[in-house]
Amino acid sequence: MANTFVNKKVDLSSTSATTLYTVPTATTAVIKSILVSEDSGNADTITITLTDTDAAVFSLFNVKAISASGTSELLSAPLVVAESEIIKVTAATANRLHVVLSALEIKPREVTT
């Protein structure tokens, strides 16, 4: 298996759902960390969802509070996500939150004879 560590970052400049990470084709990912920081000096909230390959949306964090000028680690355990699944983030207020996701991408090893 080919394993690669990646990170994805977004500055939430709107209140629209924003794609943070899409698992690549033929890959499983283990999300190790989702860090959210608030940089305006005002408390805010964030919503994080997982969309599966059938377009079903699952709430991971619904209106999660982030303290003023604070940084929060949202995961207490790794999160396994499958090929083509999507992590989306939505800020309650634009231009306050930054999000960094760290993951290990695992691709199946090619077998040759």
Give the predicted meaning of each segment.
Residues 36-41, 92:
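Short solvent-exposed strand-capping/beta-turn motif centered on an Asx-Ser/Thr pair
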Residues 46-48, 87-89:
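Hydrophobic beta-strand residues in large extracellular and virion-surface proteins
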Residues 47-51, 100-102:
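Beta-strand signatures of extracellular beta-sandwich domains
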Residues 43, 82-84, 96:
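Extracellular Ig-like/FN3 beta-sandwich strand-entry sites
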